[in-house]
């Protein structure tokens, strides 16, 4: 079980920091699990630190719920990695400052969704069709498979196809190209009413739109649908229950063509060689899964992670842990392999991968809107657990490290962490954060070192001439005064004292994920911050935030996960720089288009993916 310590874990388990126990929330409740107002200890140092808050005081924000109180709806806030939800794994959340957003207030994928409005209350058949006794299924939540099956049933079962059109058993001829003016039976009119209702429900589905066009094309009759392909873009108001059974399938985006991979006919694409064309396949939206597609494309363009999957190096790391679960890593690798062996115009269906991620993290079951950062956390945690090289984790040692200098203490803490958590995923994404808490009366300073997967950065308030990423980093690492109700208890003074809290980066990861906190929380509502943050594409120098002297803290941007919309609904896309060609592309679900590097910086940037620069670029 991953032992990356979250703030909530440290607050709940540390006898030094907490006198009163914190109740563990049930599934579906929101609990902040990143750095809040107080400093916390790592799991090995929880008995060593000399500060503890007064028991009646809690500095963690209270949960807040929006919308219906169903499990999936009320569980869209910050994830709590509990063993009863995702098995026996548990890891730290990203390190963040300030209040976290409440339940239901994430940057949610999809568009047109409003919290508090159940999509299951919608009906997609017109009233006249229902009044006439249409025999179609009256389910209020239609999957793509159901729509396709019902659509196929609209054919007159006792009719037959002829060279001049379509005839019923009674002898009436129906011209498919002139249905509106052909004589027809009352049953046929009912079916056309039902057809109209289905068309309204599936008007945004590329697959059913193609079928409708073929149905109305003169001189052709509809083909019998035996198996519906994965949906391309399910209407955002639908709550589909589609459960695909096939592997990753390539479906042609162009209308009127047979399914299967094909090359784009856009100018310039056909002249690209196979090497430069790799990695440009789109991902089909299975229904509000744009948050997942955005993160998958960012990870697909992570050079070392891509090579780990393409070269099948993950196979040697599978099955080392006591848990035999390896399906998530295998499906993720297969998906990356499919993306990188497809033509630019191909669309890959990530249905099998979604099946595995929702088995690992049930919060992603169904087709509700989700937060991209939360999805990234769960995904990396699951991949890490399945390829962890540590077969048997040693028990935590009671050895004290307080007598060591901070630099040596940090190294020892990192060594102890690797004794329990050692994977290729962690090699790429995990860094180490140093937290210090200093008493202003006696000067006693306590330090802890915690692993992190990403950093959540507050966004500077409006009024600045320009908000830069460096401003956000400085705001994250600046000294905070803990006073008043926030005073912790100093064990040396044996009283609550005014203290200074400060963060710094002890160890920089190879892949640095920066989360821009685009939510402003108030007691009334949570709003999205659309502040434009200017971030560099190359040579992001973070050496001033290092806890010790280092020259290895310069990064280059290679991917951005964007969110457009509001807290009530929106859409996720990704901007990625190819590790092969170095060119930027926009990944918008099934659509992949080239873009200029000058277009990468927008006010929709939500997650920034930086890779550690090679020595020549740091000159």
Swiss-Prot record:
Residues covered by the USP domain: 281-613
Biased amino acid composition, Polar residues: 1-17, 134-146
Catalytic activity: Thiol-dependent hydrolysis of ester, thioester, amide, peptide and isopeptide bonds formed by the C-terminal Gly of ubiquitin (a 76-residue protein attached to proteins as an intracellular targeting signal)
Primary location class: cytoplasm
Positions of region (Disordered): 1-23, 54-112, 133-175, 221-275
Binding-site positions, Zn(2+): 439, 442, 490, 493
A GO CC term assigned to this protein in UniProt: perinuclear region of cytoplasm
Compositionally biased intervals (Basic and acidic residues): 90-100
Active site location: 290 (nucleophile), 571 (proton acceptor)
UniProt keyword annotation of Manganese present: no
One GO MF term: cyclin binding
Tissue-by-tissue expression: Isoform 1: Expressed in heart, liver, kidney, pancreas and to a lower extent in skeletal muscle, brain and testis (at protein level). Expressed in testis, brain, heart and skeletal muscle. Not detected in the small intestine. Isoform 2: Expressed in the small intestine.
Region feature Necessary for interaction with MDM4, mapped onto this chain: 1-213, 417-517
Documented EC number(s): 3.4.19.12
Any single GO BP term: protein deubiquitination
InterPro entries given in the database record: Papain-like_cys_pep_sf, Peptidase_C19_UCH, Ub_carboxyl-term_hydrolase, USP_CS, USP_dom
Protease in keyword set: yes
Bias-annotated ranges (Low complexity): 259-269
Free-text comment on this protein's domains from its UniProt entry: The different N-terminus extensions of isoform 1 and isoform 2 determine their respective subcellular localization and differential effect on myoblast fusion and accumulation of muscle-specific proteins. The different N-terminus extensions of isoform 1 and isoform 4 are not essential for their catalytic activity.
Function: Hydrolase that deubiquitinates polyubiquitinated target proteins such as MDM2, MDM4 and CCND1. Isoform 1 and isoform 2 possess both ubiquitin-specific peptidase and isopeptidase activities. Deubiquitinates MDM2 without reversing MDM2-mediated p53/TP53 ubiquitination and thus indirectly promotes p53/TP53 degradation and limits p53 activity. Has no deubiquitinase activity against p53/TP53. Prevents MDM2-mediated degradation of MDM4. Plays a role in the G1/S cell-cycle progression in normal and cancer cells. Plays a role in the regulation of myogenic differentiation of embryonic muscle cells.
Self-association and partners: Found in trimeric complex with MDM2 and MDM4 and USP2. Interacts with CCND1; the interaction is direct and promotes its stabilization by antagonizing ubiquitin-dependent degradation. Interacts (via N-terminus and C-terminus) with MDM2. Interacts with MDM4 and PER1. Homooligomer. Interacts with KCNQ1; counteracts the NEDD4L-specific down-regulation of I(Ks) and restores plasma membrane localization of KCNQ1. Isoform 2: Interacts with NHERF4 and CLTC.
Protein name: Ubiquitin carboxyl-terminal hydrolase 2
Taxonomic source organism: Mus musculus (Mouse)
Organism classification: Eukaryota, Metazoa, Chordata, Craniata, Vertebrata
Gene from which the chain derives: Usp2
């Amino acid at each position: 079980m991953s032992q990356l310590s979250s703030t909530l874990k440290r607050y709940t388990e540390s006898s030094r920091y907490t006198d009163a126990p914190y109740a563990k929330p049930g599934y579906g409740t929101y609990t902040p699990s990143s750095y809040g107002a107080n400093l916390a200890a790592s799991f090995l140092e929880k008995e060593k630190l000399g500060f503890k808050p007064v028991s009646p005081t809690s500095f963690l924000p209270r949960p807040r719920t929006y919308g219906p109180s169903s499990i999936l709806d009320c569980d869209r806030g910050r994830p709590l990695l509990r063993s009863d939800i995702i098995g026996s794994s548990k890891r730290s959340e990203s390190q963040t400052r300030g209040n976290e957003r409440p339940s239901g207030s994430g940057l949610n994928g999809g568009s047109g969704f409003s919290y508090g409005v159940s999509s299951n209350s919608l009906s997609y058949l017109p009233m006249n069709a229902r009044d006439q006794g249409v025999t179609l299924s009256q389910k209020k939540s239609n999957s793509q498979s159901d729509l396709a099956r019902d659509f196929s049933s609209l054919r007159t079962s006792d009719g037959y196809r002829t060279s001049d059109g379509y005839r019923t058993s009674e002898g009436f001829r129906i011209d498919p190209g002139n249905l509106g003016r052909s004589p027809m039976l009352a049953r046929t009119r009912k079916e056309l009413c039902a057809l109209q209702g289905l068309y309204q429900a599936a008007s945004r589905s590329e697959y059913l739109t193609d079928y409708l066009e073929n149905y109305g094309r003169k001189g052709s009759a509809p083909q019998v649908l035996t198996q519906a392909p994965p949906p391309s873009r399910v209407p955002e108001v639908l709550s589909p229950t589609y459960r695909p059974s096939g592997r990753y399938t390539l479906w042609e985006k162009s209308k009127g063509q047979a399914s299967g991979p094909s090359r784009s006919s856009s100018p310039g694409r056909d002249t690209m060689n196979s090497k430069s064309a790799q990695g440009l396949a789109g991902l089909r939206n299975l229904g509000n899964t744009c948050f997942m597609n955005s993160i998958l494309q960012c990870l697909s363009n992570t050079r070392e992670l891509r090579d780990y999957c393409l070269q099948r190096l993950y196979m040697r790391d599978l099955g080392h842990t006591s848990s035999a679960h390896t399906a998530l890593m295998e499906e993720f690798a297969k998906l990356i392999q499919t993306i990188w062996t497809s033509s630019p115009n191909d669309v890959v269906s990530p249905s099998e991968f979604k099946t595995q991620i929702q088995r690992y993290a049930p919060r992603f079951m169904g087709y509700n809107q989700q937060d991209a950062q939360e999805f990234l956390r769960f995904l990396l945690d699951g991949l890490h657990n399945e390829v962890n090289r540590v077969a048997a984790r040693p028990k935590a040692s009671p050895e004290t490290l307080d007598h060591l200098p901070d630099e040596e203490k940090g190294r020892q803490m990192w060594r102890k962490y690797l004794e329990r958590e050692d994977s290729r995923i962690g090699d790429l994404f995990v860094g180490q954060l140093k937290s210090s808490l200093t008493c202003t009366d006696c000067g006693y300073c306590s330090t802890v070192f915690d692993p992190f997967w990403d950093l959540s950065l507050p966004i500077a308030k409006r009024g600045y001439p320009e908000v830069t990423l460096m401003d956000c980093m400085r705001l994250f690492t600046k000294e905070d005064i803990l006073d008043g109700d926030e005073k912790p208890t100093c064990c040396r003074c044996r009283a609550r004292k005014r203290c200074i809290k400060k963060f710094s980066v002890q160890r920089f990861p190879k892949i640095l994920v920066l989360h821009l906190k685009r939510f402003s929380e108030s007691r009334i509502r949570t709003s999205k911050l659309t502040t434009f943050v200017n971030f560099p594409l190359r040579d992001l120098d973070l050496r001033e935030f290092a806890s010790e002297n280092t020259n290895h803290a310069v990064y280059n941007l290679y991917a951005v996960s964007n969110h457009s919309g509001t807290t009530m609904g929106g859409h996720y896309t990704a901007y990625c720089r190819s590790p092969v060609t170095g060119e930027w592309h926009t990944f918008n679900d099934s659509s992949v288009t080239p873009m200029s590097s000058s277009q990468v910086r927008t006010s929709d940037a939500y997650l920034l993916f930086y890779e550690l620069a090679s020595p020549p670029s740091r000159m």
